[in-house]
Amino acid sequence: MIWHVQNENFILDSTRIFMKAFHLPLFDGSFIFPECILIFGLILLLMIDSTSDQKDISWFYFISSTSLVMSITALLFRWREEPMISFSGNFQTNNFNEIFQFLILLCSTLCIPLSVEYIECTEMAITEFLLFILTATLGGMFLCGANDLITIFVALECFSLCSYLLSGYTKKDVRSNEATTKYLLMGGASSSILVHGFSWLYGSSGGEIELQEIVNGLINTQMYNSPGILIALLFITVGIGFKLSPAPSHQWTPDVYEGSPTPVVAFLSVTSKVAASASATRIFDIPFYFSSNEWHLLLEILAILSMILGNLIAITQTSMKRMLAYSSIGQIGYVIIGIIVGDSNGGYASMITYMLFYISMNLGTFACIVSFGLRTGTDNIRDYAGLYTKDPYLALSLALCLLSLGGLPPLSGFFGKLHLFWCGWQAGLYFLVSIGLLTSVVSIYYYLKIIKLLMTGRNQEITPHVRNYRRPPLRSNNSIELSMIVCVIASTIPGISMNPIIEIAQDTLF
């Protein structure tokens, strides 16, 4: 009888433990509902690909796009909710993280229609491409919300591994293989450096891995001003710098941009910067709270080098994708100004707003490059000469996106930079803002040089690629034009309503 009662108690206790263990991930899963939608989309893609003999390509695009749109919708429905920490402190949900997650989802949603015709023309495997895009998006979203060092590293590697695979997706292309090799080697080295920095942070805080607990641990161990923290700061800055690609951590960027498939470059050029910026902001702001002067100085140096080197070297480029690679290095210098300013003078709000505009400007430019490259097979800047005479719509779209990247009024890029520089000026970053203004003028030069080529009408300057250019029917390239139209509109009109956008960002953050 006693044995029977004990056996029943054991079963009841075991059931309670099991239900508690099951309830925790089930309850916490509601905090990552947008990510769960993407996971479900990934599983659905895999199941259809593995079970169906006759694969309908349009279904793969539909499932991927629908997953992303549903994830955005789920994210918007929980907008401005109270901050929550889930999964035993590993993941944090707040307004700041959700804005960056929204930007990553927006990038991926625009990149998929941009890739449709390219994949069909190059006959690349579609399912794997979409799987890598969705998995990289998932990794970027988890990176934005990661609340401890281990989750940050795992999410970062999830994003990085998919990036390596995407950059080498055209296996028969020698340039793509070379770009992937460089990207993989430098990415592995930067990850090792980042983990080494994390180990110093872990040891100095007394064995803490959660970001806020690291601060408490540093106070308890009195190590917040120790040399170990400065070593951790240096190594972590180098590791994250690889993802942001500021100078001098930019060596991989031009080769990867030139060798990778153009839709992949479009995807990586924005998502990597958005995810890395979100992670860098939280790492610098929380664990290195007591070393703000040191990391401000480090980031100022990186921003100055990026703005000067990126824009000056871009002038000499003959490849459109390499030019945009160096342009992106300069652009990240402007974004770093917002990270340095922080939330004291609206730095975060202006940085997020500029990133929103940068996504539209950059993806719009790449949509034009994809469209032109599919019809001509060239990437040389000189081969764009006279494009306006053959395809005015494409030429005007490219010109507007480039002018917005350069920051000419009244386009979105101008107002984004203006507000970013104004926040930096109010924060006392006079030298940094002055460098930003000067390098913006330099960038206008090489953007205008391309626009001049586009608009030329003299026959002797029109290249054979443009002379033999044939615009296909609209229905054959409507997916690229869909992304192009959205990005061109976002690159031109929203700048006029800049103040409401900034106010929305500030109200959401604070």
UniProtKB/Swiss-Prot annotation:
Subunit structure, interactors included: NDH is composed of at least 16 different subunits, 5 of which are encoded in the nucleus.
Protein task: NDH shuttles electrons from NAD(P)H:plastoquinone, via FMN and iron-sulfur (Fe-S) centers, to quinones in the photosynthetic chain and possibly in a chloroplast respiratory chain. The immediate electron acceptor for the enzyme in this species is believed to be plastoquinone. Couples the redox reaction to proton translocation, and thus conserves the redox energy in a proton gradient.
Membrane topology: Multi-pass membrane protein
GO biological process: ATP synthesis coupled electron transport; photosynthesis, light reaction
InterPro entries, sorted: NADH-Q_OxRdtase_suN/2 (IPR010096), ND/Mrp_TM (IPR001750), Ndh2_N (IPR045693)
Membrane spanning residue stretches: 26-46, 57-77, 99-119, 124-144, 149-169, 183-203, 227-247, 295-315, 323-343, 354-374, 395-415, 418-438, 482-502
The family this protein is said to belong to: Belongs to the complex I subunit 2 family.
S-S bridge residues: none
GO molecular function, one term: quinone binding
PANTHER family: NADH DEHYDROGENASE (PTHR22773)
Protein name listed in UniProt: NAD(P)H-quinone oxidoreductase subunit 2 A, chloroplastic
Keywords: Chloroplast, Membrane, NAD, NADP, Plastid, Plastoquinone, Quinone, Thylakoid, Translocase, Transmembrane, Transmembrane helix, Transport
Enzyme Commission number, as recorded: 7.1.1.-
GO cellular component, one term: chloroplast thylakoid membrane
Pfam hit, one: Ndh2_N
Protein's cellular compartments: Plastid, Chloroplast thylakoid membrane
Species per Swiss-Prot/TrEMBL record: Glycine max
Catalytic activity: a plastoquinone + NADH + (n+1) H(+)(in) = a plastoquinol + NAD(+) + n H(+)(out); a plastoquinone + NADPH + (n+1) H(+)(in) = a plastoquinol + NADP(+) + n H(+)(out)
NCBIfam families linked: NDH_I_N (TIGR01770), PRK02504.1 (NF002701)
